[in-house]
UniProtKB/Swiss-Prot annotation:
Protein name: PITH domain-containing protein 1
Gene3D superfamilies reported in the protein's UniProt record: PITH domain
Native source organism of the sequence: Dictyostelium discoideum (Social amoeba)
Xref: PANTHER family: AD039 HT014 THIOREDOXIN FAMILY TRP26, PITH DOMAIN-CONTAINING PROTEIN 1
Residue span(s) of domain PITH: 11-184
Family stated for the protein in its record: Belongs to the PITHD1 family.
Record SUPFAM superfamilies: Galactose-binding domain-like
Domain of life according to the entry: Eukaryota
Listed GO CC annotations: cytoplasm
């Protein structure tokens, strides 16, 4: 199935890591990942910028290289860019698709939805690449889904760190902070979700 997605530019040499602090606004207990090998491990990859090189905590796919991460927000959010630190040995994701304000996406229906934006990713072990979003598309967000369909050749995908840069508005819309955010919700392994539904990409 064809997706209405476009690649976006990315910037090298992110010089203000402190900006990538929307993570502190996240309720990581509500973040979920589909097809993660260890249940709940995705909650530990939304680290502080200072801890981005921590290799003890990561999320790894289980049945194949695909991961779906669902991130609900507690307030209206604008996302400006995304940083991804993946694993070595070909386990870093090489593609990312984003879907906004749809909390019902899983492997059984993801091909039924057009993604909001798609990026071709590079192997980045330092967090030096920020993938910019389309400004007109990533406003008024209350839920973000990130889909990683493939990697650089490993049987499984590993992600050590995700940071979201943007603007977080308090629930009462009284305070605006430049920061990052993320949370998801869904099931664990693809075998529990599919029940025979095909999820081939085209």
């Amino acid at each position: 199935m064809a997706h209405q997605c476009n690649d976006s530019s990315h910037s090298h040499g992110v010089d203000d890591g402190i900006e990538y602090s929307l993570n502190r606004y996240l309720d990581t207990g509500t973040i979920t990942c589909l097809n993660e090998k260890v249940k709940g491990s995705v909650r530990h990859i939304f680290k502080s910028w200072e801890d981005r090189h921590d290799l003890k905590h990561f999320v790894e796919s289980c049945d194949d290289e695909e991961l779906i991460i669902n991130i609900p927000f507690g307030a209206v959010t604008q996302i400006k860019s995304i940083i991804i630190i993946g694993g070595d040995g070909g386990s870093s994701p090489n593609k990312m698709k984003a879907y906004i304000n749809n909390s019902n996406i899983d492997f059984g229906n993801i091909n039924s939805f057009a993604c909001t934006q798609e990026w071709n990713l590079h192997e980045d072990f330092e967090g030096q690449i920020g993938y910019s979003t389309k400004p007109t598309k990533f406003n008024n967000i209350n839920h973000l889904t990130l889909y990683f369909p493939s990697n650089f050749g490993s049987p499984t995908t590993k992600i050590y760190f995700i940071a979201l840069k943007g603007v977080y508005t308090s629930a009462k819309r009284e305070i605006v902070n430049t920061v990052y955010e993320s949370k998801p919700q869904l099931q664990d392994h693809k075998s529990d979700i599919f029940n025979g539904v095909s999820h081939d990409l085209s």
